[in-house]
Amino acid sequence: MTRPLFITFEGPEGAGKTSVLEALVSELKPILGDQLVTTREPGGNPISEAIRQILQPEDDNGMDDRTEALLYAAARRQHIVETILPALSAGKVLISDRYVDSSLAYQGGGRDLGVDNIWQINQFAIDGLLPDLTIYFDVPSELGLSRVMANRQGKIDRLDKESLSFHQRVRTTYLELQHDFSDRIKIIDATQPLTDVISDTRALLQEALNSRKG
């Protein structure tokens, strides 16, 4: 008998987590079949995807920082209800590209709204639901942003365009979260070649999948 497994991928801009996820899903899908569900935040269902379009335009839309934080939490709540909980209730493996730690890092740290404040907002949204495993891909802000500018080919949103100091605060907050919740959040050195990052991530996923059995 197997139990459900909730895994999240986190990281600052340019860490390469989405590329790693795509590579490993192509390996896992033939093994797990419909027992594997992949999703993203903000998004994962029509309502949350609509909120994503508001949150991530190419240019600054004048959104207030607290409005931004509340919209991310709202998108997350719908994502949980419509996508995450049904998958976990069915005993599946769900991997999400971002979850609540993104709000803590980006709005709590980057926007300087305070991690505790953002946590309180999101407590109402997640109702205690935390991942079994969070894989955090760490990269210095300067390197991450240079990757974004080189690789996204015009797909630059307003968060990408934030100041270097904003992105440095995001990374600092992620590292603090990883330190404080090291049992859940595992760190990957994302400055390595992509093949090495994939290999390190594969090992963490395999360990989590093995623990699911029993």
Curated annotation (Swiss-Prot):
Which GO CC annotations does the UniProt entry carry?
A: cytosol
Q: Which InterPro entries match?
A: P-loop_NTPase (IPR027417), Thymidylate_kin-like_dom (IPR039430), Thymidylate_kin_CS (IPR018095), Thymidylate_kinase (IPR018094)
Among the record's GO biological process terms, what is one? dTDP biosynthetic process
Tell me which positions the record assigns to the signal sequence.
Answer: none
Report the EC code(s) recorded for this entry.
Answer: 2.7.4.9
Q: Does the keyword NAD apply?
A: no
What Pfam families does the entry give? Thymidylate_kin (PF02223)
Q: What class of enzyme is it?
A: transferase
Positions in coiled-coil regions? none
Task: Give UniProt keywords alphabetically.
Answer: ATP-binding, Kinase, Nucleotide biosynthesis, Nucleotide-binding, Transferase
Q: Which reaction does it catalyse?
A: dTMP + ATP = dTDP + ADP
Name it: Thymidylate kinase
Q: Which organism is it from?
A: Leuconostoc citreum (strain KM20)
Q: What is the lineage of its organism?
A: Bacteria, Bacillati, Bacillota, Bacilli, Lactobacillales
Q: Which gene encodes it?
A: tmk
